[in-house]
A protein has these predicted regions:
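Long, low-complexity, charged/polar intrinsically disordered regions in eukaryotic proteins
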Residues: 1-26
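Long, charge-rich, low-complexity alpha-helical segments
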Residues: 29-142
Length: 142
């Protein structure tokens, strides 16, 4: 298993009602991680060692553990999108924690990271140098 952490230098994220919205400053995309994906990102953000995830997730979701490849695929996607980055094992905490009490959890489903690119042009704009005198979001034609 790869050891990962949130790539805080390139993204901003916020969790609300069991969903995490992520904005990438490096590519202008934004992402939605709901349910199981939001909970995995929560565990990663708290730097919980992956050895602890099974106990935490099995307590929260029925059917967890039937397909462990889901987590590997999710982590690979997060790495390829620049949302996650590799870290060393020593920086991770071996502790069982509670997941946020902001959603109802039922069955384990494959964690998905939905990517959206419809605001890339606006998110990648330098508001000082790339806009007209009228300001953002009025872009220079250059």
């Amino acid at each position: 298993m790869k050891f990962v952490r949130i790539n805080e230098s390139d993204i901003s994220s916020e969790r609300l009602n069991g969903e995490t919205i992520i904005i990438s400053f490096s590519n202008g995309s934004y992402y939605n991680a709901a349910g199981t994906a939001a909970d995995l990102l929560f565990l990663i953000s708290k730097q919980i060692h992956p050895e602890m995830w099974s106990e935490i997730l099995a307590k929260a979701f029925s059917g967890y553990g039937e397909d462990s490849d889901h987590i590997t695929v999710f982590i690979e996607k997060g790495l390829s999108e620049g949302i996650l980055k590799l870290t060393d094992e020593e920086s991770l905490i071996r502790k069982v924690i509670d997941l946020p009490n902001d959603t109802v959890r039922n069955n384990w489903i494959e964690p998905k990271l939905d990517k959206y690119e419809d605001f890339q042009d606006l998110l990648m704009v330098d508001p000082i140098h790339d806009t007209t005198e009228e300001g953002w979001p009025k872009l220079n034609d250059e």
